[in-house]
């Protein structure tokens, strides 16, 4: 933790299946150049029914000397869509990558704090990163299909993890490897709302698909290894309105079975598809986290209201 951080610790209580999360914003001394009024936000109070999937406590991230994320604490409920919004450079993508340790790949990155997946610390030195990234999948901003067939894009992950060879799919479907693979490909593409468009050309190169189809293929590829959490970093930012609408419909459908955390610059998109929204502002600070309707209709923080209404950012 940096000496520049001066916050009261977050509290977490649970009563009758309802979890309460409280956070306190940084003191005025922590935000050089901003007025006291800008940083004098009251603590946010967020309640949700059901179970917590991810729990983040006092998370800080530095890239060299740059303090990119400051003392973030929040809990993410399972089987829901959590949107992360904020201006460019506010730390929302950095935060997203912390949830499956993608920042570990950046040599200059230093991470302090705790992230738990169903009570298990993912930053434990003995954590299995391959297994972690199977449980918490990632879909990136730009579609990145493998230069292979559509079929191979889907089956690559399960084969790499040994699911097919170890007979996991045999137990699920009672068929040999070839039939298991076919079932897996069809199931994953149907989940990603792509099957009807590509079922007659599974052996075609995936690079021949449109941008929107490629992104849904990447989502299907993520689903093929049966994750519990799906992280999405602006998955529709490079797509046209029709393709974007399909991605949004897909995200809402996926939240019935998966926990989805999505970064978006599109506030209208966040309002349409998410159950709860976290607002990050310049300096890597989580300013407010609440039900999406509350964030967009009656935010507690004046800074969040100014951002939502376009007064800055």
Curated annotation (Swiss-Prot):
**Residues annotated for ATP binding in this entry:** 86-93
- Give the CDD domains listed for this entry: ABC_PstB_phosphate_transporter
EC number(s) on file: 7.3.2.1
Q: Which UniProt keywords apply?
A: ATP-binding, Cell membrane, Membrane, Nucleotide-binding, Phosphate transport, Translocase, Transport
Q: Name one GO cellular component term.
A: plasma membrane
Oligomeric state and partners? The complex is composed of two ATP-binding proteins (PstB), two transmembrane proteins (PstC and PstA) and a solute-binding protein (PstS).
Function description: Part of the ABC transporter complex PstSACB involved in phosphate import. Responsible for energy coupling to the transport system.
What general EC class does the enzyme of this chain belong to?
translocase
**Organism of this sequence:** Haloarcula marismortui (strain ATCC 43049 / DSM 3752 / JCM 8966 / VKM B-1809)
Q: Where in the cell is it found?
A: Cell membrane
Among SUPFAM superfamilies, the record links this protein to:
P-loop containing nucleoside triphosphate hydrolases
**Catalysed conversion reaction:** phosphate(out) + ATP + H2O = ADP + 2 phosphate(in) + H(+)
Tell me the Pfam families matching this sequence.
Answer: ABC_tran
Q: What is this protein called?
A: Phosphate import ATP-binding protein PstB 2
Listed under GO biological process in this entry are: phosphate ion transmembrane transport
Q: Where is this region: Disordered?
A: 1-40
Task: State any single GO MF term.
Answer: ATPase-coupled phosphate ion transmembrane transporter activity
Which ranges carry the ABC transporter domain? 54-308
Protein family according to the UniProt entry: Belongs to the ABC transporter superfamily. Phosphate importer (TC 3.A.1.7) family.
Which membrane topology describes this protein?
Peripheral membrane protein
Primary location: membrane
Q: Write out the biased-composition intervals (Polar residues).
A: 1-33
